Amino acid sequence: MSASLLQFVVLLGVMAALVVPVGNWLYGVATGQKDTALERLTYRVIGINPRERMDWKRYGLAIVVSNLVMLLLAYLLIRLQGALPWNPAGLAAQSPDLAWNTVVSFMTNTNWQAYSGEQSLSYFSQMAVITTFMFTSAATGFAAALAFMRGLAGRDGTNLGNFWVDVTRLIYRVLLPVCFGLALVFVWQGMPQTLGAYANATTLEGAAQRIALGPVASLESIKHVGTNGGGFFSMNAAHPFENPTPLTNALHILSMLLLPSALTYVFGRMLGNLKQGWVIFGGMLVMFVGFLGTVYSFEQAGNPILSKLGAEQAITATQAGGNMEGKEVRFGIAQTSLFATTTTAATTGSVDSMHDSYTGMGGFVPMLQMMLNNVFGGKGVGFINFVQYLVLGVFIAGLMVGRTPEFLGKKIEAKEVKLTMLAVLAHPLSILGFTALACVLPGALNSLNNPGPHGFSEILYAYTSGTANNGSAFAGLSANTFFYNLTIGLSMLMGRYLTLLPMLAVAGMLAAKRRVPAGSGTLPTDTALFGALTVFVILIVGALTFLPALTLGPVADHLQMLRGVVLK
């Protein structure tokens, strides 16, 4: 137990220690006026004016148009895979519905995979489509967050920045250098990085085996730095080529948390009020630690059904103990629990264990984190989701004292509240709506491999993961069907754009408003009390919205397990 807690403290301590230096670096990237020679060349090639100012409408339009163009190009490349180079295994193109699901998944930073990477995509597709989207989707979300911050901090609604400049700088100055250095470390730790043919080997039993290789290290670095999550191999970070050592596992966890946590400090610097950034960071960290403790407790306690059968599940010198089904022995319960909590908090979606094999309440937490979708979150969208609850918290507090609510010196009026509620409600509408549809269609139910509450949990998890742009899965659901490829693809689009665009509009509207001086009735938003109020609002809204569905799924699954019922 003490060793497990030490791992948590060390990794979270390193993350917290890096918030300020990384935040200062990102702030410099976001506010710098000088362009590098490579950036100026890029602007000339794509024909943009880097000094152009964009309001929220133009910024949002640039996001949508650029994403649509990339979507169409990526779909074409996936469908023509069989005729393109760097395909040593001779893999055929994906079906139209699977190709749709794949390109939408990686364009929205979801990285949901209804396919096995090493058996479905060529080296060219992995690099030209998958890895490229990992950079552009991360930069897009990050850029949207910076524009959102400028709107909240600014006094000019016509200047939320320039989308093309933000994306270019983030890729050149942040993502590429960090990922290049990290990829070198991964190669040193044993990850493959090759364009050569698959390796052929003979097993101990004398059977022939073909071992998939490829440019793994380069994909793995941006996979976690960009909170993408899609794996080169079907086993994702549980595969020894994607995650060969405990050091790479720790680096994966840190990579996922590094930039999202630092964004809170960037926000504080943009506002000129560091306390506001620390309040957001503190609220996220409190929820993260609570969720981590819950996952670890239930997984370390083990499976009561096995305990009744006499299985030894206690921690000893020779075993990690607990519920080790679906987990890597080399990582144990502690690192696995931390990875699962991190990947669903940071909307990454990569896994070093099978979430479908967790206990009922162990699987409850990853699902709930994606439903809330604001505990650190991914590159930008998670931060925006947290701030939308800050706006709600201010609005609720204003109603309680009978005053017009104010946030950062700007009055929160009906338009802002309506757009915020659109962003808040789009999330459960997608998750619960598509889950309900799948539960009443016999064809959709045929994809289940488990009956009862656990089967329902698999469907609920799939649409939660898609809408939250996470990408992890309860893998017992056979999702490569026309229905799931189509509907999960739609849920990804709803989760991405019906959150991002309305909140970008809120930022633009607030930027155009005149600041009002703080009065006796102004609620300060940079205090621990307001941070606690925001966390309370997040948990209450999440509980009221999703608790009925969670009760039918993972909670009922856990209660059945306590009764000794395996599947029913």
Curated annotation (Swiss-Prot):
GO annotation terms (biological process): potassium ion transmembrane transport
Signal peptide: none
Single GO term (MF): potassium ion binding
Highest rank taxon of the organism: Bacteria
Transmembrane segments: 8-28, 60-80, 129-149, 170-190, 247-267, 278-298, 381-401, 421-441, 471-491, 492-512, 528-548
Disulfide bridge positions per record: none
A UniProt-annotated Pfam family: KdpA
Keywords: Cell membrane, Ion transport, Membrane, Plasmid, Potassium, Potassium transport, Transmembrane, Transmembrane helix, Transport
Location(s) in or outside the cell: Cell membrane
Membrane topology category: Multi-pass membrane protein
One of the record's GO cellular component terms: plasma membrane
Function as written in the Swiss-Prot or TrEMBL entry: Part of the high-affinity ATP-driven potassium transport (or Kdp) system, which catalyzes the hydrolysis of ATP coupled with the electrogenic transport of potassium into the cytoplasm. This subunit binds the extracellular potassium ions and delivers the ions to the membrane domain of KdpB through an intramembrane tunnel.
Subunit description: The system is composed of three essential subunits: KdpA, KdpB and KdpC.
Family label: Belongs to the KdpA family.
Classification via HAMAP family: KdpA
Protein known as: Potassium-transporting ATPase potassium-binding subunit
Species this chain originates from: Deinococcus radiodurans (strain ATCC 13939 / DSM 20539 / JCM 16871 / CCUG 27074 / LMG 4051 / NBRC 15346 / NCIMB 9279 / VKM B-1422 / R1)
Gene: kdpA
